[in-house]
Amino acid sequence: MRNYDLSPLLRQWIGFDKLANALQNSGESQSFPPYNIEKSDDNHYRITLALAGFRQEDLDIQLEGTRLTVKGTPEQPENEPKWLHQGLVMQPFSLSFTLAENMEVSGATFTNGLLYIDLTRNEPETIPPQRIAINERSALNS
């Protein structure tokens, strides 16, 4: 019998409350780049990516339907240094998140090597139930 760990997949879903709770309780390792997902209230979320060494022009954020994709392509140095120790990763990446319905990207900022993507859930206005009048109608004579 095989067991499959779905927590890495759940980490990519934002705006689903049950999955957000699973995210908070999941202690799984993260892939590059490391990121956090914060929930400030029921309608506001923030994704923070740690991108040391990247410049703003190296980054691209796209939203297609409910798929939010962040791509980074760092500029390659002319002369590759001879590393004694390389702890900072500077590699191209593409990271995608699936947003829940009614989630919108409200903004993105890049400060001190951290990319912040703010998300807002916009609940559609609920339309009150409509009462339908029942008219009296005489029976059809056949």
Swiss-Prot record:
<dbReference type="GO" id="GO:0005737">
    <property type="term" value="C:cytoplasm"/>
</dbReference>
<keyword id="KW-0346">Stress response</keyword>
<dbReference type="InterPro" id="IPR037913">
    <property type="entry name" value="ACD_IbpA/B"/>
</dbReference>
<dbReference type="Pfam" id="PF00011">
    <property type="entry name" value="HSP20"/>
</dbReference>
<dbReference type="InterPro" id="IPR008978">
    <property type="entry name" value="HSP20-like_chaperone"/>
</dbReference>
<dbReference type="GO" id="GO:0050821">
    <property type="term" value="P:protein stabilization"/>
</dbReference>
<comment type="similarity">
    <text>Belongs to the small heat shock protein (HSP20) family.</text>
</comment>
<feature type="domain" description="sHSP">
    <location>
        <begin position="26"/>
        <end position="137"/>
    </location>
</feature>
<keyword id="KW-0963">Cytoplasm</keyword>
<dbReference type="InterPro" id="IPR002068">
    <property type="entry name" value="A-crystallin/Hsp20_dom"/>
</dbReference>
<protein>
    <recommendedName>
        <fullName>Small heat shock protein IbpB</fullName>
    </recommendedName>
</protein>
<dbReference type="InterPro" id="IPR022848">
    <property type="entry name" value="HSP20_IbpB"/>
</dbReference>
<keyword id="KW-0143">Chaperone</keyword>
<comment type="function">
    <text>Associates with aggregated proteins, together with IbpA, to stabilize and protect them from irreversible denaturation and extensive proteolysis during heat shock and oxidative stress. Aggregated proteins bound to the IbpAB complex are more efficiently refolded and reactivated by the ATP-dependent chaperone systems ClpB and DnaK/DnaJ/GrpE. Its activity is ATP-independent.</text>
</comment>
<comment type="subunit">
    <text>Homodimer. Forms homomultimers of about 100-150 subunits at optimal growth temperatures. Conformation changes to oligomers at high temperatures or high ionic concentrations. The decrease in size of the multimers is accompanied by an increase in chaperone activity.</text>
</comment>
